[in-house]
Amino acid sequence: MEVTGRLFIWAILAVSCGAQLNSTEAEGKSRCTASLGGANLGETHKALVLQLSANENCTWTIERPENRSIRIIFSYIKLDPGSRCETENIKVFDGSSTSGPLLGKACSRNDFVPVFESSSNSMTFQIVTGLTKFPRSVFIFYYFFSAATVIPNCGGDLRALEGSFSSPNYPKPHPELAYCVWHIQVGKGYKIQLKFTDLLLEMDENCKFDFIAVYDGPSTTAGLLKQLCGRGKPTLESSSDAMTVVLSTDYANSYKGFSASYTSIYIHDVNTTSLSCVSDKMRVIISKSYLPALNYNESNLQLNDPTCRPNVSNVIEFSIPLHECGTVKKIEDHAISYTNRITFIESPVSAVITRQKLLQIVVTCEMEYNSTVEIMYITEDDIIQNQSVLGKYNTSLALYESDSFENLVQESPYYVDLNQTLFVQATLHTSDPSLVVFLDTCRASPTSDFASPTYDLISSGCCQDETCKVYPLFGHYGRFQFNAFKFLKHLNSVYLKCKILICDNNDQTSRCNQGCVPRRKRDIPSYKWKTDSVIGPIRLKRDRSASRDSGLLPQIHEAEISNQPLSRLYLFSFMVLALNVVIVAITTVKHFLNRWMDHRYQKLQVY
């Protein structure tokens, strides 16, 4: 009888756990731990409305015998808006328990629609609520899917300055259980304007079922611009050069979906023209309002190579590669410059006369010390307008694990042993294949500001350290190796700074082709294409075993010996202080003993 009673109690508990998935607990703590799915292979999806009370700690597990992944979507979350994410949140775990890897967390302050995917056939999510009484509600939709199943035209990368896209099957009904992501990325200096020319999805006040989520950035964790459903033709704008659009559909009520187009808007003010140079291209921006005043339009523009066309939005942009589109490279006194020409093609009404101004824009990028200088001048009927701005070389300095220079060291700081061989590579990021990198000077310092002391590894292209080895010229890469060391009387950190020279590989008299010049027989300041790169810190491991094998062992011992007199002084001072404390203590005790003797009771004399 006792066994039967226990079974009856367990049955009541099991029923109450399952009922909580679709019922509301107005007061008190609900029993909300349950297992979902797994029993019925025909059940591929499920929608739940969870009503939660205060002070809950609920856990649900989704499982399925078939080896398929799970996608769970929290399309509507109503938690206590005044709670902190640490005390009231939703956590999703990859696996059949909360001990699995955490896929992510959501709370009332999240500015995105939480969507998570498992790596296998099980997933667990946990909801914890705070002590405040508040009507909480969460809408959850999950389904099983196979990564091998692909829906055509469902998402993609859009890189042009303008374009269009639509939901799968548009204008026919969209597919069920679709999750499509479009990443829109335009050029730097632009923002994106997205227009929905047609939109028809399942209508719902909170867009819980079929919806579009538009994010202000390159991923679904960027700020949510808007969650859309129903009908309409909204227009949205990003704050940067990236935008992400998501379409999520459930298992019922499919409509025709959406059609959208986007354009790019240049965010900077351009009165007439502007020029900028980077390591691999020149970028010319021409204001659209500048051309009508001269009776031209964008179709009249061309570069030296007329097949290279501009991108047109609210401005006209030429992105000119340094070794394409008719760009002319010039070497003069070892200085490298790149020049191209934008001309306005006239459509004359007569072969004899014209009433249009003859206009051309000449753009030049010249390499300068630690930078590039951009020069632009416009000729308009013998009138020359000059413009110039400054930029920097795009170079980097990095550590690699071996002399193959394939595996980049990602750690920062990088912990090494004394005397360990380190491999360093300087990289020039440019599209010009004829440029070559030369390591002129590489210097080490225990501090990032490279104040004294410093130690030269390479000077004037020559190794100054016995463990240093400079590799031969290799295109856009300058490489060398050396053995790790430490600075005496400093922390075990080392920073590296290298001065890099960039030359034309065809210039046989350039500094790069001279190699090591010990006595500085050339004038480095006359070379304009020069830049600095810094890396660090490199730190020694706490293991001292490498120090015993290092050639720096005598120097380390010397540093320890030099500190011994100072240690003896500290010991002597401590002994004197201790002796003074003892003397003061004895004097104090003696004083109290004397006072006690003076105040003892004495026998009175009898008269």
From Swiss-Prot:
Main subcellular localisation: membrane
Residues listed as glycosylation sites in the UniProt record: 22, 57, 67, 419
Subcellular location: Zymogen granule membrane
Any single biological process term in GO: cell adhesion
Transmembrane segments: 569-589
Presence of the UniProt keyword Transmembrane helix in the record: yes
Lumenal side: 20-568
Keyword line: Cell adhesion, Cell cycle, Cell division, Cytoplasmic vesicle, Disulfide bond, Glycoprotein, Membrane, Repeat, Signal, Transmembrane, Transmembrane helix
Annotated membrane topology: Single-pass type I membrane protein
Biological function: Localized to zymogen granules, where it functions in trypsinogen activation. May indirectly regulate cell motility, cell-cell and cell/extracellular matrix interactions.
Listed name of the protein: CUB and zona pellucida-like domain-containing protein 1
Name of the gene this protein is made from: Cuzd1
